[in-house]
Amino acid sequence: MKPIVEVFKTNVQHPELAEQIISILRRRLPVSRINFDLEVCDKILRVEGEQICVETIIEILSSRGLACEVLT
């Protein structure tokens, strides 16, 4: 099965916060590859895996007061 890649625009500014979010997401998506690119203006979150629930990822960030939307 070919992996799915979802890319999100966020407002995560700091590497420490990005690591916390990655840790939380890895508990929910243990076999996914997850990373942030904080160097670009959209503060990109990239998730790659066989099954990705976009709504869950957005909900996890939103519940922590963070903006998160699918980058189209």
What annotation goes with each model-predicted range?
Residues L38-D42:
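Short Gly/Ser/Thr- and Asp/Glu-enriched loop/turn motifs at secondary-structure junctions
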Residues K43-V47:
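A generic structural motif
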